[in-house]
Design a protein with these regions (language model features):
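Gly/serine-rich nucleotide phosphate-binding loop at the start of the catalytic core
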Residues: 19-22, 27-29, 34-129
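Positively charged, low-complexity nucleic-acid-binding target-recognition regions
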Residues: 26-28, 32-49, 54, 332-333, ...
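Substrate-contacting helices/loops that form the catalytic groove of nucleic-acid
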Residues: 95-118, 196, 204-343, 416-450
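Acidic carboxylate diad motif detector
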Residues: 103-204
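Short polybasic amphipathic segments
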Residues: 168, 173-179, 238-242, 386-389
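Short acidic-glycine loop/turn motifs at beta-strand connectors
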Residues: 171, 205, 243-246, 373, ...
Length: 450
C-alpha cells in the first residue's frame, strides 16, 4: 500500500510497518497512562492526608462502684489474655521453633471462651480481648524490628489499661463504650472536633480513672510561617539553649519533690502490707509521683509550642539518651530532664503546623567547634569548660550557645545538601573533616600571616 500526505513523497507501507507504528502508539500511551495513574494516586494520597492529624484527648472519668468493678474486670481480663497468649507463643517456639500469629490466636481465644475454666472472660467486651492479642502482635513486631525489647508478662502492678477499638462515643459528659450502656461520667473539658476512633481506659497508681480518645481531624488553623530557623542545644544546667542565646531553665522536678517523696516512702515502709494505713500511704506516694510527672509534662508542652510558634526550621541533636543514661552520675538528671519526651512533643507539633525538625548526627562535635572559623578545640570535651576563646580567630564562646549555633549551621547545610540523616559514624566524621578543611586552612593561614 502506498500513502501520500500533505505533499510529502509517497511511501510504501507494509504489514510490518503497520505493526511497528501500532506497537509504538500502544507503548507510548501505556507508558503515559501509567505515569498519569501514579501521579493521580500520589495526589489522592496528598489531598486525603492534607491538613489531617491524629489527636488524642484525655479526660478524667468518674465511675460509680458498679462501673469501677466492671472496669477492674476489663483490666484483669485484658491482662490475662495478653499473658496467656504470650506464654503460648513462648512455649510453641520452645517446642517447634515457630509460634501462632494474631489470626491463629484469635481463633484460640474464641475456643477459650467456651471452656468452663475460662468462661469468665466473656463478661467483658470481646473486642477488648482481641485488641490485647493485637497488642501482643505489635510487641513482637517491634521486637523483631529492634524497636523494643522482648515482650514481658504484665503483673497486677503494671499499668492498668484496656483499649476499645470501636463503638466509642461521648455525649452529655458521659463516655459510652460496649458493656457500659448507661455511660461513665466524664469531665469533657475540651471540645472533640474530629472523628472518634479507639479509646484507652486507664487507672493510675493514685486511683484515678482516665480515658484517652484517639481521633482523626482536620487541622484547620496551622501556625503562621515566620521564615526563621533555630538551633537547640539540650543540656542539664539549662534544659534548652537556642542559637539566639535564649535559655529555657531546667526545673528539675524530681529534685524539687525529692525530700517530700523520700519522707512519704519512708512512712510507707513502716506500714504493714495489706492494711488500710498501707493503702492510704501508698496513694500519697503515688500522688507525689503523679505531681512530678504532670508538672514536667506541662512545662515541656509549653517549651515545645513556644519554639514551634516562632520558628519554621528547628535543628536539634539526635542524642543517644539510652546510652547516656549508662553514666550513673548523670542518669538521674537526664531522666528528670526528659529530653526524649521533649523531642517527641516538638516533632509532632512541628508536623501539625507544617514546620520542620532536623535531627543532626550525634557524632557532630557541636560544643568543640568554633562556629566562626571551624577550629575544633579538644579541650572543651571537659564539661566543666563553660566558656572558651578560639585560639585561631580569638572569638569568645559560651559553650552552649556556640553548640546551638553549630547545630543550626550543620542542620541547614544538611537540608541544602540532602544529607540530613546519617547512619554511619565514620561517614559523618569524614564529611565533617572534609567540610571544615578549607575553613581551617584559611584560618591557620591568616593566623600565620597576621
Amino acid at each position: 500500500m502506498v500513502l501520500s500526505c500533505f505533499g510529502f513523497p509517497a511511501i510504501e507501507v507494509t504489514d510490518d510497518t503497520y505493526m511497528s507504528i501500532f506497537t509504538r502508539i500502544i507503548f507510548f500511551h501505556a507508558t503515559n497512562i501509567h505515569k498519569l495513574l501514579v501521579v493521580y494516586k500520589i495526589m489522592l494520597i496528598f489531598v486525603s492526608d492534607m491538613g489531617k492529624i491524629n489527636r488524642t484527648y484525655k479526660f478524667r472519668l468518674y465511675p460509680n462502684k458498679a462501673q469501677a468493678d466492671l472496669l477492674a474486670r476489663h483490666f484483669g481480663c485484658a491482662r490475662f489474655v495478653y499473658n496467656y497468649f504470650l506464654n503460648q507463643r513462648k512455649e510453641q517456639y520452645r517446642l517447634t521453633g515457630e509460634s501462632d500469629n494474631y489470626y491463629a490466636q484469635a481463633k484460640t481465644l474464641t475456643a477459650l471462651k467456651k471452656q468452663e475454666a475460662t468462661a469468665w472472660i466473656k463478661e467483658v467486651n470481646s473486642q477488648t480481648l482481641q485488641f490485647a492479642i493485637r497488642s501482643l502482635e505489635i510487641a513482637y513486631t517491634n521486637f523483631f524490628q529492634k524497636r523494643a525489647k522482648f515482650p514481658n508478662f504484665k503483673s497486677k502492678r503494671s499499668k492498668n489499661s484496656f483499649t476499645v477499638p470501636q463503638f466509642v462515643s461521648i455525649a452529655n459528659n458521659r463516655l459510652f463504650i460496649p458493656k457500659f450502656k448507661e455511660g461513665i461520667k466524664c469531665c469533657v473539658h475540651r471540645e472533640i472536633k474530629g472523628k472518634i476512633g479507639k479509646a484507652t481506659i486507664s487507672k493510675t497508681p493514685s486511683g484515678k480513672y482516665f480515658v484517652s480518645v484517639f481521633t482523626e481531624e482536620e487541622y484547620a488553623t496551622p501556625l503562621e510561617k515566620t521564615n526563621k530557623s533555630v538551633g537547640l542545644d539540650m543540656g542539664l544546667k539549662d534544659l534548652l539553649i537556642t542559637s539566639e542565646g535564649e535559655t529555657f531553665k531546667n526545673n528539675r522536678y524530681t529534685r524539687k519533690y525529692e525530700r517530700k517523696l523520700a519522707r512519704a516512702q519512708q512512712h510507707l515502709s513502716r506500714k504493714k502490707k495489706g492494711s488500710r494505713g498501707f493503702e492510704n500511704q501508698r496513694l500519697k506516694v503515688a500522688r507525689i509521683h503523679e505531681k512530678i510527672s504532670n508538672s514536667r509534662a506541662d512545662y515541656l508542652h509549653k517549651c515545645s509550642i513556644s519554639i514551634v510558634r516562632r520558628y519554621d526550621t528547628i535543628c536539634i541533636e539526635d542524642l543517644n539518651v539510652k546510652g547516656m543514661k549508662r553514666n550513673h552520675h548523670l542518669a538521674k538528671s537526664i531522666t528528670d530532664a526528659s529530653w526524649g519526651s521533649f523531642v517527641t512533643m516538638l516533632t509532632y507539633k512541628a508536623d501539625w503546623n507544617g514546620k520542620t525538625v532536623v535531627k543532626i548526627n550525634r557524632y557532630f562535635p557541636s560544643s568543640q567547634t568554633c562556629n566562626v572559623c571551624g577550629y575544633v578545640n579538644k579541650r572543651t570535651k571537659d564539661l566543666s569548660v563553660r566558656d572558651w576563646e578560639c585560639p585561631v580567630c580569638h572569638t569568645h564562646h559560651n559553650r552552649d550557645v556556640n553548640a546551638a549555633i553549630n547545630i543550626l549551621h550543620f542542620g541547614l547545610n544538611s537540608i541544602s545538601a540532602g544529607t540530613v540523616d546519617y547512619t554511619d559514624g565514620e561517614e559523618v566524621r569524614a564529611n565533617l573533616l572534609k567540610g571544615r578543611s578549607s575553613l581551617k586552612s584559611e584560618a591557620h593561614e591568616s593566623l600565620a600571616h597576621g
